């Protein structure tokens, strides 16, 4: 049996200066949605991928929270030697996006090169009450546990 392995990276944790300017939503969604790279995509609590950046910005402005780190950018990557199918990665992206969808707007894009990976872009301002995603260790750990649970259903091992 071949074991597929996956890793999670919380981008703004390794690059704390990222995602603080007013063009963050548009820039990151444009990069991740590049048609030369993205093979699939989806949204939660957004009308469409086309309007996602403006909708996220509007939510932040509505609650006067258009400052500081604006996006939670999470990458879930899979090892190339045992590549999962695109439909499997789409189901995984959808299940992982639902973790945030009760309070936050989410867009995800799936890229296939150099390794299959999911870019999950979460607006850090809640559309429910305007509170910012706290991004504490416990929050990241809860998401990691959720992803581990989702992946285990596909026989994929999540590395720490």
Task: Write out the residue ranges for each language-model feature.
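N-terminal nicking endonuclease/strand-transfer module with a His-rich metal-binding environment
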Residues: 1-160
């Amino acid at each position: 049996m071949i074991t597929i392995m996956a890793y999670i990276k919380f981008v703004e944790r390794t690059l704390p200066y990222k995602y603080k300017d007013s063009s963050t939503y548009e820039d990151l969604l444009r990069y991740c949605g590049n048609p030369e790279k993205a093979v699939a995509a989806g949204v939660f609590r957004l009308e469409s991928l086309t309007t996602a950046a403006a909708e996220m910005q509007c939510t932040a402005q509505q609650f006067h929270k258009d400052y500081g780190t604006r996006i939670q950018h999470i990458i879930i990557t899979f090892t190339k030697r045992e590549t999962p199918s695109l439909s499997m990665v789409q189901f995984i992206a959808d299940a992982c996006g639902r973790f945030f969808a009760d309070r936050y707007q989410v867009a995800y894009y799936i890229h296939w090169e150099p390794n299959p990976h999911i870019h999950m872009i979460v607006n850090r301002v809640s559309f429910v009450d305007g509170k910012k995603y706290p991004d504490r260790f416990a929050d990241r750990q809860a998401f990691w546990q959720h992803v581990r649970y989702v992946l285990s259903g596909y026989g994929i091992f999540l590395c720490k």
